[in-house]
Amino acid sequence: MKVEICVDNLESVITANQFPIDRIELCSALAVGGLTPNLGFIQQAQQISTIPLALMIRPRAGDFLYSEDEIQIMLNDIATAKQLGIQAVVFGALSANGEIDLATTELLVKASQGMEITFHRAFDLCKDPITALEQLIDLGCHRILTSGQAATAFDGIPVIQQLVKQANGRIQVMAGCGVNADNVKQIIEQTKVPEIHFSAKGQRQSLMDSISSARMGTSSQDNVLDIADSQKIKGILKYISLL
Protein backbone atom coordinates (compact mmCIF):
# COMPACT_ATOMS: atom_id res chain seq x y z
CA MET A 1 0.00 0.00 0.00
CA LYS A 2 1.39 3.38 -1.05
CA VAL A 3 0.37 6.55 0.72
CA GLU A 4 0.29 10.06 -0.77
CA ILE A 5 -0.50 13.30 1.04
CA CYS A 6 -1.39 16.55 -0.72
CA VAL A 7 -0.11 19.80 0.77
CA ASP A 8 -0.06 23.48 -0.15
CA ASN A 9 2.38 24.96 2.35
CA LEU A 10 5.85 24.29 3.71
CA GLU A 11 4.64 23.67 7.25
CA SER A 12 2.67 20.69 5.94
CA VAL A 13 5.70 19.40 4.01
CA ILE A 14 7.67 19.42 7.26
CA THR A 15 4.85 17.62 9.08
CA ALA A 16 4.51 14.98 6.36
CA ASN A 17 8.22 14.19 6.58
CA GLN A 18 7.73 12.97 10.14
CA PHE A 19 5.75 9.98 8.87
CA PRO A 20 6.28 6.94 6.59
CA ILE A 21 4.58 8.53 3.60
CA ASP A 22 5.54 7.48 0.08
CA ARG A 23 4.84 10.66 -1.88
CA ILE A 24 3.89 14.29 -1.32
CA GLU A 25 1.70 16.01 -3.88
CA LEU A 26 2.85 19.61 -3.91
CA CYS A 27 0.15 22.17 -4.72
CA SER A 28 -1.01 25.65 -4.05
CA ALA A 29 -4.63 26.54 -3.25
CA LEU A 30 -5.99 23.20 -2.06
CA ALA A 31 -9.22 25.03 -1.29
CA VAL A 32 -9.95 25.03 -5.04
CA GLY A 33 -8.64 21.51 -5.63
CA GLY A 34 -4.97 22.38 -6.00
CA LEU A 35 -3.03 24.54 -8.46
CA THR A 36 0.60 24.61 -9.59
CA PRO A 37 2.78 25.86 -6.72
CA ASN A 38 5.31 28.64 -7.14
CA LEU A 39 8.99 28.01 -7.83
CA GLY A 40 10.23 29.17 -4.44
CA PHE A 41 7.91 26.77 -2.63
CA ILE A 42 8.96 23.87 -4.87
CA GLN A 43 12.66 24.51 -4.33
CA GLN A 44 12.33 24.87 -0.57
CA ALA A 45 10.23 21.71 -0.37
CA GLN A 46 12.98 19.88 -2.26
CA GLN A 47 15.53 21.14 0.25
CA ILE A 48 13.48 19.95 3.21
CA SER A 49 11.76 16.78 2.05
CA THR A 50 13.26 13.31 1.97
CA ILE A 51 9.94 12.07 0.56
CA PRO A 52 9.52 12.13 -3.25
CA LEU A 53 7.45 15.03 -4.58
CA ALA A 54 4.67 15.01 -7.16
CA LEU A 55 4.01 18.43 -8.68
CA MET A 56 0.49 19.57 -9.48
CA ILE A 57 0.28 20.96 -13.02
CA ARG A 58 -2.91 23.00 -13.09
CA PRO A 59 -2.73 26.62 -14.27
CA ARG A 60 -6.03 27.85 -12.85
CA ALA A 61 -9.10 26.92 -10.85
CA GLY A 62 -12.32 25.82 -12.51
CA ASP A 63 -12.85 23.28 -15.27
CA PHE A 64 -10.29 21.19 -17.14
CA LEU A 65 -10.99 22.45 -20.65
CA TYR A 66 -7.82 24.36 -21.53
CA SER A 67 -6.93 26.89 -24.21
CA GLU A 68 -3.74 26.63 -26.26
CA ASP A 69 -2.11 29.28 -24.09
CA GLU A 70 -3.05 27.41 -20.91
CA ILE A 71 -1.66 24.18 -22.35
CA GLN A 72 1.60 25.98 -23.04
CA ILE A 73 1.70 27.10 -19.40
CA MET A 74 1.33 23.46 -18.37
CA LEU A 75 4.11 22.40 -20.73
CA ASN A 76 6.34 25.15 -19.33
CA ASP A 77 5.66 23.98 -15.77
CA ILE A 78 6.37 20.35 -16.69
CA ALA A 79 9.68 21.44 -18.23
CA THR A 80 10.53 23.28 -15.01
CA ALA A 81 9.63 20.21 -12.95
CA LYS A 82 11.93 18.08 -15.08
CA GLN A 83 14.79 20.59 -14.76
CA LEU A 84 14.37 20.60 -10.98
CA GLY A 85 14.47 16.81 -10.79
CA ILE A 86 10.89 16.42 -9.57
CA GLN A 87 9.92 12.74 -9.48
CA ALA A 88 6.29 12.97 -10.61
CA VAL A 89 3.72 15.31 -12.15
CA VAL A 90 -0.04 15.45 -11.76
CA PHE A 91 -2.38 16.81 -14.43
CA GLY A 92 -5.65 16.30 -16.25
CA ALA A 93 -7.35 17.72 -19.34
CA LEU A 94 -10.85 17.14 -20.68
CA SER A 95 -12.76 17.95 -23.84
CA ALA A 96 -15.94 20.02 -23.83
CA ASN A 97 -18.09 16.88 -23.95
CA GLY A 98 -16.60 15.32 -20.82
CA GLU A 99 -14.07 12.98 -22.40
CA ILE A 100 -10.30 12.77 -21.96
CA ASP A 101 -8.67 15.42 -24.16
CA LEU A 102 -6.52 12.90 -25.98
CA ALA A 103 -4.40 15.36 -27.96
CA THR A 104 -3.58 17.55 -24.97
CA THR A 105 -2.95 14.61 -22.65
CA GLU A 106 -0.63 13.03 -25.21
CA LEU A 107 1.35 16.28 -25.39
CA LEU A 108 1.61 16.48 -21.61
CA VAL A 109 2.58 12.82 -21.27
CA LYS A 110 5.33 13.15 -23.88
CA ALA A 111 6.66 16.24 -22.13
CA SER A 112 6.69 14.33 -18.82
CA GLN A 113 8.82 11.40 -19.95
CA GLY A 114 11.21 10.37 -17.18
CA MET A 115 8.73 11.33 -14.46
CA GLU A 116 5.78 9.41 -13.05
CA ILE A 117 2.43 10.69 -14.31
CA THR A 118 -0.81 10.89 -12.36
CA PHE A 119 -4.04 11.89 -14.10
CA HIS A 120 -5.90 13.72 -11.34
CA ARG A 121 -9.57 13.93 -10.40
CA ALA A 122 -10.53 15.48 -13.70
CA PHE A 123 -11.09 11.76 -14.28
CA ASP A 124 -14.12 11.98 -12.00
CA LEU A 125 -15.79 14.38 -14.42
CA CYS A 126 -15.49 11.99 -17.38
CA LYS A 127 -18.85 10.80 -18.68
CA ASP A 128 -17.52 7.28 -19.30
CA PRO A 129 -14.90 6.23 -16.73
CA ILE A 130 -14.45 2.78 -18.24
CA THR A 131 -13.42 4.16 -21.62
CA ALA A 132 -11.41 6.95 -19.98
CA LEU A 133 -9.35 4.46 -17.98
CA GLU A 134 -8.42 2.50 -21.10
CA GLN A 135 -7.44 5.72 -22.87
CA LEU A 136 -5.17 6.77 -20.02
CA ILE A 137 -3.53 3.35 -20.01
CA ASP A 138 -2.90 3.65 -23.76
CA LEU A 139 -1.51 7.16 -23.33
CA GLY A 140 1.05 5.96 -20.78
CA CYS A 141 -0.21 7.44 -17.51
CA HIS A 142 1.05 5.60 -14.44
CA ARG A 143 -1.93 6.21 -12.15
CA ILE A 144 -5.25 7.94 -11.75
CA LEU A 145 -6.52 9.76 -8.69
CA THR A 146 -10.24 9.18 -8.26
CA SER A 147 -13.12 9.38 -5.83
CA GLY A 148 -15.05 6.95 -7.99
CA GLN A 149 -16.92 9.87 -9.58
CA ALA A 150 -18.60 10.57 -6.23
CA ALA A 151 -18.40 13.39 -3.70
CA THR A 152 -15.94 11.33 -1.63
CA ALA A 153 -13.92 8.16 -2.12
CA PHE A 154 -16.07 6.44 0.49
CA ASP A 155 -19.21 7.22 -1.51
CA GLY A 156 -17.44 6.08 -4.68
CA ILE A 157 -16.38 2.65 -3.39
CA PRO A 158 -18.42 0.67 -5.97
CA VAL A 159 -16.92 2.54 -8.94
CA ILE A 160 -13.38 2.48 -7.51
CA GLN A 161 -13.75 -1.26 -6.98
CA GLN A 162 -14.74 -1.66 -10.62
CA LEU A 163 -11.83 0.50 -11.82
CA VAL A 164 -9.28 -1.51 -9.82
CA LYS A 165 -10.56 -4.74 -11.37
CA GLN A 166 -10.51 -3.22 -14.85
CA ALA A 167 -7.01 -1.80 -14.42
CA ASN A 168 -5.66 -5.20 -13.36
CA GLY A 169 -2.26 -3.70 -12.60
CA ARG A 170 -1.90 -1.91 -15.95
CA ILE A 171 -2.32 1.45 -14.21
CA GLN A 172 -2.44 2.27 -10.51
CA VAL A 173 -5.78 3.40 -9.11
CA MET A 174 -5.34 5.79 -6.19
CA ALA A 175 -8.41 6.56 -4.08
CA GLY A 176 -8.72 10.09 -2.76
CA CYS A 177 -11.11 12.80 -1.53
CA GLY A 178 -12.50 12.75 1.97
CA VAL A 179 -10.22 9.92 3.11
CA ASN A 180 -9.83 9.86 6.90
CA ALA A 181 -9.20 7.53 9.83
CA ASP A 182 -12.88 6.62 10.02
CA ASN A 183 -13.19 5.33 6.46
CA VAL A 184 -9.73 4.48 5.12
CA LYS A 185 -9.83 0.84 6.24
CA GLN A 186 -13.19 0.24 4.59
CA ILE A 187 -12.16 2.02 1.37
CA ILE A 188 -9.01 -0.08 1.03
CA GLU A 189 -10.59 -3.39 2.01
CA GLN A 190 -13.59 -3.02 -0.28
CA THR A 191 -11.86 -1.54 -3.33
CA LYS A 192 -8.43 -3.23 -3.11
CA VAL A 193 -6.77 0.01 -4.23
CA PRO A 194 -2.96 -0.15 -4.15
CA GLU A 195 -2.62 3.55 -3.28
CA ILE A 196 -4.44 6.04 -1.06
CA HIS A 197 -4.42 9.87 -1.15
CA PHE A 198 -5.43 12.34 1.55
CA SER A 199 -4.79 15.83 2.91
CA ALA A 200 -5.31 15.21 6.66
CA LYS A 201 -6.55 18.78 6.74
CA GLY A 202 -6.49 20.61 10.03
CA GLN A 203 -6.30 24.23 11.07
CA ARG A 204 -4.30 26.39 13.39
CA GLN A 205 -4.69 29.95 14.51
CA SER A 206 -2.39 32.63 13.17
CA LEU A 207 0.56 33.45 15.43
CA MET A 208 0.10 37.17 14.83
CA ASP A 209 -0.64 39.24 17.93
CA SER A 210 -3.51 41.10 16.31
CA ILE A 211 -5.56 40.72 13.16
CA SER A 212 -7.02 43.68 11.28
CA SER A 213 -10.63 43.66 10.13
CA ALA A 214 -9.30 43.95 6.56
CA ARG A 215 -9.62 40.82 4.44
CA MET A 216 -7.27 39.54 1.75
CA GLY A 217 -9.97 37.84 -0.33
CA THR A 218 -13.38 36.23 -0.04
CA SER A 219 -12.48 34.20 3.05
CA SER A 220 -13.29 35.52 6.50
CA GLN A 221 -10.66 33.15 7.93
CA ASP A 222 -7.44 35.09 7.35
CA ASN A 223 -6.50 34.38 10.96
CA VAL A 224 -6.71 30.60 10.43
CA LEU A 225 -4.23 28.51 8.44
CA ASP A 226 -5.07 25.18 6.82
CA ILE A 227 -2.33 22.64 7.53
CA ALA A 228 -1.71 18.91 7.51
CA ASP A 229 -2.74 17.68 10.97
CA SER A 230 -0.23 15.24 12.45
CA GLN A 231 -2.87 13.53 14.57
CA LYS A 232 -5.05 12.93 11.52
CA ILE A 233 -2.07 11.52 9.63
CA LYS A 234 -1.34 9.19 12.56
CA GLY A 235 -4.95 8.04 12.60
CA ILE A 236 -4.97 7.20 8.90
CA LEU A 237 -1.60 5.45 8.96
CA LYS A 238 -2.59 3.45 12.03
CA TYR A 239 -5.46 1.82 10.16
CA ILE A 240 -3.39 1.26 7.03
CA SER A 241 -0.70 -0.50 9.09
CA LEU A 242 -3.30 -2.97 10.38
CA LEU A 243 -4.27 -4.15 6.89
Curated annotation (Swiss-Prot):
A Pfam family this chain is assigned to: CutC
Gene Ontology MF terms: copper ion binding
Subcellular location(s) per record: Cytoplasm
Main location: cytoplasm
Protein name: PF03932 family protein CutC
Domain of life: Bacteria
Record keywords: Cytoplasm
A Gene Ontology cellular-component term: cytoplasm
Protein family per UniProt: Belongs to the CutC family.
Stretch forming the signal peptide: none
